[in-house]
A protein has these predicted regions:
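Adenosine ribonucleotide-centric catalytic and binding domains
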Residues: 59, 65, 145-147
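Active-site- or DNA-interface-adjacent structural scaffold in DNA-acting proteins
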Residues: 76-144
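A short structural micro-motif
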Residues: 66-67, 108, 344
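Single, function-defining residue in the core of a domain
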Residues: 1-59, 63, 91, 101, ...
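An active-site-proximal beta-strand-loop segment
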Residues: 144-154
């Protein structure tokens, strides 16, 4: 294997320990806490997410009580915790500490990208993912039916709506009320906050097709936000004018441009066409797809050979709009990574507070892996595995050195890493 450009230990050192210590004081996260201080919970979750693909409270207990973890983060070897104390702490610990820690780390790590590398990060993919749990465990959530196998125990789901910029989530919200089952209700909550933060309006928001109401399109436009989404091919609209001419490039990759038009969308409430102009790009797959509906029961997505994209950006070419929408798939890959490799497919804590703490810590750990895999040109799974193994090698060497009392052999930065948690 070729030499790594960035070591795992270098990335761990980038975690702003001084700022975490300040956050501990300002948020009072450690009030009445002994063994499980805010910083210890922070590092415990990072270590556990890196160590296992599926984490539980009992695994967190096991991790905390290992000499290896305590050595790495300079915790007294006689310190002990139980899974019960971890459960209680997650349900009551101050959430603000983790929210602000995520913001600080996101800002620090995103600065590692050059100006040229950061340009694609103005393309913000917004989408949602659901995670389910049995009703008797999850305190809040959407009831979505019965357990597989005909059991009588219902299941509940939590919706996570995220704005992904290609590096990490710029913003995320957790929804447990059935009002937010519809993307037309959940996604505007995230979009409004994003647009307010983007004072120069440089971002282009790539939206799931569930975001489809005229009211939502108008709200984004009124806030001067730019978006691209997908609409149904039978959407009622009034053509204002065409943007195509003899110089228009109709090659959109695996799609061929059929039309590029300015339209007025139909307002169902007012029963008339809206006066706001939107741009609709009509394209067709070059290789026809099988549109036969499957014989199995249940709701299935309709397969079509045509794709209609909608945007309020009239400056980009149709090809750039199509390429931007294709990037929407990146957030699906990100969700898959979180669920398969960072224990995001189930609930470590079922309390509302604990769920949000785990969310922020999952995203922080994902950032560590994202930087490592990018710099060392690896995939998600191998990147995470290699990160952890490299970290373990370093800890073994550290423990050996400490046991031999050869502290002079330790670099200053290594000692500083150990001293992060008193």
């Amino acid at each position: 294997m070729k030499d790594k450009k960035v070591r795992a230990i270098d990335i761990l050192r980038m975690i702003p320990c001084e700022e975490l210590a300040k956050l501990s004081l300002s948020t009072k996260v450690d009030y009445c806490a002994k063994a499980l201080s805010g910083e210890r919970v922070f590092y415990l979750l990072v270590y556990a997410f890196l160590a296992a693909d599926e984490v539980s409270q009992r695994k967190l207990e096991t991790v905390f009580n290992t000499d290896m973890f305590k050595t790495l983060f300079n915790i007294s070897l006689d310190a002990k915790v139980t899974h019960g104390s971890i459960s209680t702490r997650l349900s009551k610990i101050d959430l603000t500490f983790f929210e602000k820690a995520y913001e600080v780390i996101y800002q620090r790590f995103s600065r590692m990208y050059t100006k040229e590398e950061a340009l694609p990060m103005n393309l913000i993919r917004v989408d949602s993912s659901m995670v389910a749990e049995t009703c008797n465990k999850l305190k809040k959530g959407f009831t979505v039916g019965k357990k597989p196998g005909g059991g009588k125990t219902s299941r509940k789901q939590i919706k996570y709506t995220m704005a992904y910029d290609g590096f990490s989530a710029k913003l995320t919200e957790v929804f447990s009320d059935s009002t937010y089952l519809s993307e037309d209700m959940a996604m505007p909550e995230v979009l409004t906050q994003l647009i307010k933060k983007d004072s120069n309006h440089e971002n282009l928001y790539v939206l799931d097709r569930g975001f489809s109401s005229l009211e939502n399109y108008d709200n984004v436009t009124e806030q001067r936000g730019k978006f691209v989404g997908r609409i149904k091919t039978n959407r009622k609209m009034e053509v204002v004018r065409s943007l195509m001419d003899e110089t228009t490039d109709t090659d959109l990759g695996n799609l061929e441009l059929q039309d590029d038009i300015v339209v007025h969308l139909y307002d169902r409430e007012k029963k008339e066409f809206s006066e706001t102009e939107y741009r609709v790009i009509k394209a067709r797959f070059k290789v026809p797809r099988d549109t036969t509906r499957p014989a199995n029961k249940g709701k299935v997505k309709r397969v079509e050979n045509e794709v209609y994209l909608i945007t309020n950006d009239f400056g980009l070419t149709a090809k750039l709009i199509a390429e931007a929408y294709k990037k929407r798939w990146d957030i699906e890959v990100f969700f898959k990574f979180l669920k398969q490799n960072l224990s995001f497919s189930h609930f470590i804590s079922t309390s509302e507070n604990g769920i949000k703490v785990i969310l922020y810590m999952t995203l922080i750990t994902a950032m560590l892996v994202m930087i490592y895999k990018r710099e060392n040109e690896m995939g998600y799974t191998i990147g995470k595995f290699s990160f952890f193994m490299e970290m373990q090698d370093w800890v073994v060497k550290l423990m050996t050195t400490l046991q031999n009392e050869k502290l002079s052999l330790l670099a200053y930065e290594d000692m500083r890493l150990r001293a992060r948690i008193p």
